[in-house]
């Protein structure tokens, strides 16, 4: 008789954003005229940018012509023309990437959860708290021990490593979801040194790097020496295309 994975019983009853949606709906039912800034799930706020629409149309047209049609690519890691474009994007930050160091997958969220499948279930996982739910849930489902580094006002919402605490896998998100804090170059140097001392791997979620404006805040952990030896970076190139409008951002800043 099949048995269940009892680790799933360690998860919350509902996905975090389902609970947030229920609370929002209840609040709006009681306060229909109240202004509300939604800070739950990251839904789009504007129509897709015209340049993206035209690019997708062009791509669809190419698939209808024998000379430009593309099927599966051979490597399983993404078309070379796309990986070259990604490498060019990283060059803006002074980061040099070989094509075999780049993998195109179905999204940063999926990768942050699925990447741990290649690691043993006995690894200790360090996650900054608060954190994006997928970091915690994906590891709890596999029965791993999850420990936390608190991000709060006392440290500027930028949790730093405790040399007395051991971890095998480390999740960092910069700029952070949900706090918005971002690690400086010196802070990332400290995390890299900690990872090397523990022979640990950093899983670095850089999905929101496009919103960084401070020159002292790296867009990629690979801007910091030694990162390639201990870090796997997940990035997204979709966050600026209608995901956050200037009007929306200014409203948040005013609060």
Language-model features, listed with the residues they occupy:
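N-terminal small-domain helix-loop-helix segment of the aminotransferase-like
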Residues: 3-6, 10-106, 114
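Glycine-rich "substrate-gating" loop/helix at the edge of Rossmann-like oxidoreductase active sites
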Residues: 8-12, 179, 237-239
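Short catalytic/ligand-binding loop motif for oxyanion handling, primarily in non-cytosolic enzymes
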Residues: 45-49, 178-181, 211, 241-243
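Conserved core of the PLP fold type I
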Residues: 67-195, 209-228, 232
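Residue-level marker for buried hydrophobic side chains located in beta-strands
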Residues: 202-203
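Walker B catalytic acidic pair
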Residues: 206
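Active-site PLP attachment segment
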Residues: 223-251
């Amino acid at each position: 008789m099949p048995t269940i994975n009892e680790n799933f019983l360690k998860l919350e009853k509902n996905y975090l954003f389902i609970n947030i949606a229920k609370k929002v709906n209840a609040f709006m039912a009681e306060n229909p005229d109240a202004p509300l800034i939604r800070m739950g799930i990251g839904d789009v706020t504007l129509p897709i940018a015209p340049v993206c629409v035209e690019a997708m149309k062009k791509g669809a047209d190419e698939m209808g012509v024998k000379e430009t049609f593309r099927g599966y690519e051979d490597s399983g890691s993404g078309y070379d023309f796309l990986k070259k474009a990604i490498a060019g994007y990283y060059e803006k930050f002074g980061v040099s990437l070989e094509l075999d160091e780049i993998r195109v997958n179905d999204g940063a969220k999926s990768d942050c959860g699925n990447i741990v499948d290649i690691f043993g279930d006995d690894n200790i996982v360090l996650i900054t708290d608060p954190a994006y739910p997928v970091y915690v849930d994906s590891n709890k489902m596999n029965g791993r021990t999850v420990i936390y580094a608190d991000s709060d006002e006392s440290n500027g919402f930028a949790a730093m490593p405790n040399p007395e605490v051991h971890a095998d896998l480390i999740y960092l998100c910069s700029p952070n979801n949900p706090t918005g804090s971002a690690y400086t170059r010196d802070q990332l140097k400290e995390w890299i040194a900690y990872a090397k001392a523990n022979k640990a791997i950093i899983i670095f979620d850089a999905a929101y790097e496009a919103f960084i404006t401070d020159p002292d805040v790296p867009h990629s952990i690979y801007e910091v020496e030694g990162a390639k030896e201990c870090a796997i970076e997940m990035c997204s190139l979709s966050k600026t295309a209608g995901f956050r409008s200037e009007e929306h951002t200014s409203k948040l800043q005013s609060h």
